[in-house]
């Protein structure tokens, strides 16, 4: 379901189910989504790991941005600017902005934060467009939600409004009382969108590898930690 023009890969008019399955296959092929034994930042052991930082070439990054752009277009997300938290969000915001314009003629400014404030030249804590109006926050994955919460605060401090959040993968894991997604939505009144969530991955594995050790470990893990 890819439409190719030379080396350019564009996704057009896919159903959401097709978009999800194509994204999972892309993520596995490019090793953004890996299965094995991993230790997360939280210290929790996980049978899978997701990292869009491995989209480290023009073609891979373009393909990744196409999935975000298609999701935005299909779900008619309305916003005035795109904000990507440092560091991975910097390339995400810029590439998504580029592909929205290339594929759908939707031209939106983008911005990111600096980890440290710049005190000379282009001073301040922001890179890119000034924040004005309603913002879409883009990131690769939502686990604890810490970078998303920081982004919400940055946008509000700049007198703009965070209106929506879009991540590639929602891990849907239980925190202290509920998932990070539920916490962000209930505390801020902001909808969290994801191209896929971990249930989509498990459903995909069940169809492809129902009796595999990978599927069984994933199912056991989610039964313990998912909300």
Predicted regions and their residues:
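PRPP-associated nucleotide enzymes
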Residues: 1-138, 146-227
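Active-site-proximal mixed secondary-structure blocks
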Residues: 143
């Amino acid at each position: 379901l890819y439409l190719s023009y030379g080396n350019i890969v564009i996704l057009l008019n896919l159903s959401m189910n097709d978009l999800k399955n194509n994204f999972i296959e892309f993520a596995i092929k490019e090793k953004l989504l890996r299965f094995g034994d991993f230790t997360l930042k939280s210290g929790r052991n996980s049978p899978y790991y997701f990292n869009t930082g491995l989209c480290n070439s023009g073609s891979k990054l373009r393909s990744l941005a196409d999935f975000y752009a298609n999701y935005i277009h299909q779900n008619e997300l309305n916003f005035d600017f795109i904000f990507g938290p440092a560091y991975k969000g910097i390339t995400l915001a810029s590439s998504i902005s580029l592909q929205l314009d290339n594929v759908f003629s939707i031209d939106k400014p983008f911005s990111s934060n600096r980890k440290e404030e710049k005190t000379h030249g282009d001073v301040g804590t922001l890179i890119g467009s000034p924040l004005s109006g309603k913002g879409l926050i883009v990131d690769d994955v939502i686990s604890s939600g810490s970078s998303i919460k920081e982004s919400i605060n940055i946008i509000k401090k700049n007198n703009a409004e965070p209106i929506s959040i879009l991540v590639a993968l929602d891990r849907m894991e239980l925190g202290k009382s509920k998932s990070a997604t539920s916490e962000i939505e209930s505390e801020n009144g902001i909808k969290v969108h994801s191209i896929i969530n971990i249930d989509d991955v498990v459903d995909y594995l069940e169809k492809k590898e129902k009796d595999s050790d990978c599927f069984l470990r994933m199912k056991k893990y989610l039964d313990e930690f998912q909300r």
